Amino acid sequence: MDILLKERLVSYYEKHILEDVMPFWDRRCIDKEYGGYITCFDREGKMTDDKKYIWFQGRQLYIYSLLYNKVRKKKEWLENAKHGFSFLVKYGYAGDGRWNYVLDRKGNVLEGTISIFSDFHVLQGVAELSLIHISEPTRQAE
């Protein structure tokens, strides 16, 4: 791939993600009342469902943690990651290394451990969040 084309594509997607995609989610997904993330919206931003699918909770945790780790040390992204992690640990874990599939908005289990995708996305999110806590003391000491 041509270097100039690659740079233009990176610039385009970075701008789109940081100026369009993330502001859409930042304004809507943090559930300040019950914890975790509200993730079911239509393209106009209207909530279509308030169920909390654990795979999406894990994915959102991953995105906020990844943005903090790789793009910018934005305090809001770190707070949003910790916010989702707290909800997941409190309500999403089913035991024996498994995660529930879907909860109601308050965190009550609607469907238990039916999907390995829930397990995967939560582990991916937790792993990325853990990199923050492993590297932060080192960064502060530098």
Regions picked out by a protein language model, each given a short descriptive name:
Residues 2, 52-68, 78, 114-130:
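Well-ordered alpha-helical segments within folded domains of soluble proteins
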Residues 1-54, 75-83, 87-99:
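Low-complexity, Ser/Thr/Pro/Gly-enriched N-terminal "stalk/linker" regions
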Residues 132-142:
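Single conserved hydrophobic/aromatic residue that forms the stacking wall/gate
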Residues 82, 86-126:
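Well-ordered mid-protein domain cores that form the structural environment of catalytic cofactors
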